[in-house]
Regions:
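N-proximal low-complexity "stem/linker" segments adjacent to membrane-targeting elements
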Residues: 1-24
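Acidic helix N-cap motif at the loop->helix transition within catalytic regions
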Residues: 14-17, 42-50, 92
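A conserved acidic beta->alpha catalytic loop
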Residues: 22, 29, 37-46, 60, ...
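Glycine-rich, basic loop-to-helix element that forms the pyrophosphate-binding segment
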Residues: 59-75
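Short aromatic/hydrophobic "clamp" motif used to bind/position activated sugar donors
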Residues: 80
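Conserved donor NDP-sugar-binding/catalytic core segment of glycosyltransferases
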Residues: 88, 92-123
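Conserved nucleotide-sugar donor-binding catalytic segment
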Residues: 126-214
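Membrane-proximal basic amphipathic "stem/tether" segments
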Residues: 220-285
């Protein structure tokens, strides 16, 4: 089972080598790593040229979503994954994902996510939960760094929405559920999100407003009973209330993760939990 990793890139030369090394240390026999770069002017291309196994292009694109879709179309693997430049995989992620996805009835697998700072200290553990259709219209339950999915999804023309710049991962996950693809949640961590202060997910009032608007677009795309107007302040407030009201349900889902894990019997050789990320865990030996 070949795994294709897609990395969208723009001026992240100081981090991208850790992402590349974290793919190499998986010790997985059949993989490809594709980097889609948006004409970076830092040292990104110098780093990429050090690794001849990487397939990469550096050309103008229309943003992260467009770069991802270009990479997905270039990919030749049976399983696809999306790793941002400033994040990295933990050891064992590929083998575990491949074992789970050997089930022909499954379409994707995702896990929890760890956060680390610039000093490699683990600062947060994000716990996900099993997939729920309606909840996916309000909350993103899949961390893109921790998601592996089968190529047939892209072959069926389900791609990342290019009109979204903050919630495209939420929209992609919701689209999979509403097209009845089967996803499996695992109580492990496949990857680490590096928090450096310039992340796209850093919260500001403007970005919060944009995420609400994009969330409304996702909601409108999949529900058949009501449409909200993202330009209407009352509708934006209504959507925000919906997110707040559903938080207790998310807490309940997370509380039942242990029960779900026992039911599904996916004890597939867990690797050690990392209390602290390190350069070794990102591939520097």
């Amino acid at each position: 089972m070949k795994i294709s990793v897609i990395t969208p890139s723009f001026n992240q030369g100081r981090f991208i080598e850790d992402a590349i090394r974290s793919v190499l240390i998986q010790d997985y026999p059949d993989f490809e790593h594709i980097v889609v770069d948006n004409c970076s002017w830092d040292n990104t291309l110098e780093v990429l040229q050090k690794y001849p196994h990487i397939r990469w292009v550096s050309e103008p694109d229309r943003g992260q979503s467009h770069a991802l879709n270009k990479g997905f179309r270039m990919a030749t693997g049976d399983v696809l994954a999306w790793l941002n430049c400033d994040d990295f995989y933990l050891r064992g992620a590929f083998h575990t994902a491949a074992r789970v996805l050997s089930d022909p009835h499954l379409d994707g697998v995702y896990s929890d996510l760890q956060f680390c700072d610039l000093n490699w200290r683990i600062t947060k553990h994000y716990q996900s939960h099993r997939p729920v259709k309606f909840l996916s219209l309000f909350h993103n339950f899949i961390s893109s760094e921790c998601f592996f999915f089968k190529r047939r999804i892209v072959d069926n023309n389900i791609l990342v929405r290019e009109d979204l710049h903050y919630c495209m991962d939420q929209a992609f996950a919701a689209s999979l559920l509403y097209h009845n693809y089967r996803l499996r949640y695992m109580k492990d961590c496949f990857a680490v999100f590096r928090w450096h202060g310039a992340n796209k997910s850093v919260d500001t009032p403007w970005r919060r407003s944009q995420r609400t608007r994009e969330g409304i677009r996702i909601f409108n795309s999949h529900n058949g009973f009501v449409q909200l107007d993202e330009e209407n302040p009352r509708h934006r407030q209504l959507y925000a209330w919906g997110r707040t009201l559903l938080k207790p349900y998310r807490v309940f889902l997370k509380a039942t993760n242990d029960i779900d894990d026992k039911i599904h019997h996916h004890k597939l050789g867990r690797w050690p939990s990392f209390g602290r990320a390190s350069r070794r865990s990102a591939g520097e030996i």
